[in-house]
Amino acid sequence: MYLAYCHLHSRMSADAEVPMAELAKLALDAGLDEVCYTDHVEPKVVFGAEVDWEAVVSEFESAQNAIGDRIKLHLGVELGDAPWDFEAAESLMANAPELDFIIGSIHCLTPELGGMNMYNYVPTNDREAYLGIEDYLSQLKKLVDWGKFTVLGHLTVPLRYYFRKGFKQVSFDPYEEEVREILRTLIHKGRGMELNTNLGDGPVPGAKWLRMYRELGGEIITLGSDTHKPEAIGKGIREGQQLLRECGFKQFCTFEKQQPIWHTL
């Protein structure tokens, strides 16, 4: 079993604190074969922060020097909320170093709904929760139509936060056709999807959507758990591989210079 972990945040993300070198050592201790760092970057309009690409590269090189060839390391990013300003997102990425992997993600509600990060959004009733899902899907469609990323990150991610806030009855089932169309576009553009193991707290997306993606012809799939804390590194990856097998996948991907490398499940 080849264990690759392709969604990992270091201190290069504003919401994480651990150096890349320390994460590499922890990944090695956890029995992983490969990790890809995917720290947050967003168009400046989202959070007003610049990206210090030189610092990112320096941090990555320090990790490489610390770990040597004991584990394979790749450098990627999680590009968040590009639909807020596609031109700014393209300008941001034009200045990036050569990256192995780009996760395209939606984290925030649109400015029309307050622009709040969904982590902080607390609906007061089911209708507000579903409005959040509709807002998310509208942005996701724009993101996938744009397509300038490697894989789509954590499809159905609003459920992660809703469930933690007690809205466990809310689902994406009423939007099956919208999700199907998004997946068709993703496949047509030659992009992939992430299985985010969600630190073992219920995968995003779940089995229904993984099977839909596979039945539509989707093959490009990566695994990661979106960890921001050292104790969670690698969590759920083995179980994620089993879930992919159950959903009809025979292989999963890692990426080098944004080209897929296939691994048997």
Features from the language model and the residues they span:
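Hydrophobic residues within beta-strands of alpha/beta enzymes
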Residues: V35-Y37, I102, L152, M193, ...
